[in-house]
Amino acid sequence: GPEGSIELTLLDGHKAVFTPEQPLQLPQWFHRRDEELEAQAQALKARAGESGYVEKSNKDETFRYHIARVNDEDDGIHEEPMLTNEDLVLGIRPEFLSITGGGNVECEIYGAMPTGMESTVKVRIGEYLLTGVVFGSTLFTIGSKHLLDITGSSVMLFDRSSGRRITSGTLKLL
C-alpha cells in the first residue's frame, strides 16, 4: 500500500490496516516528537530558574480517552500501562462506523436510539462498546448481528504516550 501503511491489532485481536493520507515514516515522526518534548522540557527548566517564575496551576496533561466496555466497573481512570511507540490511538467519528453491510468484523447491536433521519447505535465487539451514527430510518433490533466497517478518509491516528496527532487516513478492518 501507500508509504507508511500500518498494520494494527485492535479490539481484542482484530486486524486492521491504517493508510495515512500523506506518506508517513513513523520512526522519524517519533524521533521528531522526542526532540520536541526534550526541547520543551529544557525550556521549562530554564524558565523555572528565572526570578519571578510561577508554576502553572493548570498544567498541560495528556488526554486520557475511555473506550466503553460491556462490564465497566467504574468510570475512574485506571493505572496507565507502560507505553511504547507501538501504542497508538485511533480517533473515529461516530458516522464512520458502518453496519449496513460490507464489513469484516461481526458486531452486535447493544443499544439503538432512532432520532428522526438517523439512529445512534451502540455496537458490541467482544467486550468493547462503540458508538455510531447511522443515517436513514433503519430500525435496529437489540442483539441482532451485523458486519462492521469503518468508512471515511479522516480517521485520526494519535501517539498514545504524548497524546499528539500523528496524521489522518483510512482504516480497513481485515
State each model region's role.
Residues 1-174:
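Non-catalytic connector elements of ABC transporters
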